[in-house]
Amino acid sequence: MSEKLYPVLPEAKKNTLIDNETYLEWYEESVSDPDGFWAKHGRRIDWFKPFTKVKNTDFNGDVTIKWYEDGVTNVSYNCIDRHLKSRGDKVAIIWEGDNPYIDKKITYRELYENVCRMANVLKKHGVKKGDRVTIYLPMIPEAAYAMLACARIGAVHSVVFAGFSPEALAGRIVDCESTFVITADEGVRGGKPVALKENTDTAIDIAAKQYVMVNKVLVVRRTGGKVSWGRGRDLWYHQEVASVEPHCEPEPMNAEDPLFILYTSGSTGKPKGVLHTTGGYLVYASMTHQYVFDYHDGEIYWCTADVGWVTGHSYIVYGPLANGATTLMFEGVPNFPDQGRFWEVVDKHHVNIFYTAPTALRALMGAGDEFVTRSSRSTLRLLGSVGEPINPEAWEWYYNVVGDQKCPIVDTWWQTENGGILITPLPGATDLKPGSATRPFFGVKPVLVDNEGNVQEGVADGNLCISDSWPGQMRTVYGDHKRFIETYFSTYKGMYFSGDGCRRDEDGYYWITGRVDDVLNISGHRLGTAEIESALVSHHSVSEAAVVGYPHPIKGQGIYCYVTLMTGADAQDPDELRKELVQHVRKEIGPIATPDKIQFAPGLPKTRSGKIMRRILRKIAEDEFGALGDTSTLADRGVVDDLIENRQNKK
């Protein structure tokens, strides 16, 4: 544990929206009188019909979560229309292309027109309130237009990260029975094209075999690359928007109407469709964006995430735009044209607030300080971290080298399921400890529970649960409420279980220690081990597979695969087969799931009842096999000896 304490910077304290006294006062009110607190803050968004009920939640039995349930509003209206009078000519989105010489500024008035046109295109082609629309786009302004257009007409968007494979895209189309897809001819990433339309065509064919028929595909021309065309199905975005009106009335939405589905990995193979609704989600995204980043009107805010992840939903699109902010959207990667790109963008667009992932920071730290110090970064006021715990070394580098010791760091903990940040410092209120997410946001009640379900008080280690609801919380797993209850509420009764381990120190600060279930955190993105295992087993040479994480210097966790082969398959050249399996997993899931280590083994360590002992596999992958713990239930000890002998991570 880091013993260093960084007191609130005088500059941060001077202009802050929330000082420590206010934090303590508000927090106390938020947990002792949630109805009163959230009624007050629920009015930060505009309502067509004001709510009279605030909180109606129960973590027991059938688990119901409702906030502002009789209120009527529209997310797109709150992110655009309500700003037009006072800040119509203010820049809403700064788009920075993959190519450093290409950028675009979109004002709130232009955003209104673009979103209304896209909304009218959706309506023209039969998309109605409640229909699911799949968005498979690169980081271009049209991705934000598409999300806001869906919200405007009451369609439910499902954004799929443009790095996912056709198979992964198809699975997400099928699960929510989406019949309308928005994509691009190609994406551009690090100077290289990404075949999005081709992937979409393949995904649609796969979905059709599972009886889900996509009727229309709206294609944004990004590169002008050659694409195949489905007559009567495929539509060019630029032609369609030219043929419709630039005005579209926002659909009145009940606070509990669905806003979006976003798929996230679980500990079982099939990704879960996390469902977020309208009112509570927007209140929470908007409020956390304002107070965590201490956002002041006129500042330039940049979150480097992709809209394919929840961070992009809440902190590139919905939170900032609900607050009338200027949000920067970056198409590129941190190391193209070179490792100084982030800091060049900061200087070019005078960025004040910068929010990124520890994986990117560790990679940039390894490239050397000169890429940072050659830029001025004089406009930076606040730094943020998201996606995984940040190790103290990377934190110190971020603070000292990137921030020149003048920018507080908000190390934020939250998940797709949470809708917004749950544990975080507030820049003008919280003394910082490198590596700690520090204290809960308003209304959030963290609890540490041991494996037997006993609540731990004071200084403790345990499983991180939240004992009461907050407005941004997911409502269900799309189409599978039973799975929602089983995943999050069955392990510890009456509490939401995050799946993360956590430590609380003597100051009441929280330190996230990583996943405690079979989910990996690769470069800040979640992947279920079961998902990777089923991809491996679908290869004709593989009989069985077990996947675990191990510490990785850049990605946080690496992917270590133990594979047993079909009879006869071991005659192949092992290096060639390894390459083949890596390609196979990339094809099934996407590059994000690329295995780092593959170890071929005659067998896996199992109990006499046939259960794989993953604890042992983790220890071997970490090269820590001296402490394997109790192995008395092992069916065959010889299997473990072979695994140790042939481990891929020998130090």
From Swiss-Prot:
Residues at which ATP binds: 387-389, 411-416, 500, 515, 526
Essential cofactor(s): Mg(2+)
GO cellular component: cytosol
Keyword field: Acetylation, ATP-binding, Ligase, Magnesium, Metal-binding, Nucleotide-binding
Pfam families: ACAS_N (PF16177), AMP-binding (PF00501), AMP-binding_C (PF13193)
Positions annotated to bind Mg(2+): 537, 539, 542
Annotated InterPro entries: Ac_CoA_lig, ACAS_N, AMP-bd_C, AMP-bd_C_sf, AMP-binding_CS, AMP-dep_synth/lig_dom, ANL_N_sf
Catalytic activity entry: acetate + ATP + CoA = acetyl-CoA + AMP + diphosphate
GO molecular function terms attached to this record: acetate-CoA ligase activity; AMP binding; ATP binding; metal ion binding
Positions bearing N6-acetyllysine: 611
EC code(s) of this entry: 6.2.1.1
Binding positions (CoA): 189-192, 311, 335, 523, 586
GO BP annotations, alphabetical order: acetyl-CoA biosynthetic process from acetate
Post-translational modification: Acetylated. Deacetylation by the SIR2-homolog deacetylase activates the enzyme.
Record function comment: Catalyzes the conversion of acetate into acetyl-CoA (AcCoA), an essential intermediate at the junction of anabolic and catabolic pathways. AcsA undergoes a two-step reaction. In the first half reaction, AcsA combines acetate with ATP to form acetyl-adenylate (AcAMP) intermediate. In the second half reaction, it can then transfer the acetyl group from AcAMP to the sulfhydryl group of CoA, forming the product AcCoA.
Family designation: Belongs to the ATP-dependent AMP-binding enzyme family.
NCBIfam families reported for this sequence: Ac_CoA_lig_AcsA, PRK00174.1
Protein name: Acetyl-coenzyme A synthetase
Highest classification ranks of the organism: Bacteria, Pseudomonadati, Pseudomonadota, Alphaproteobacteria, Hyphomicrobiales
Gene name in the database record: acsA
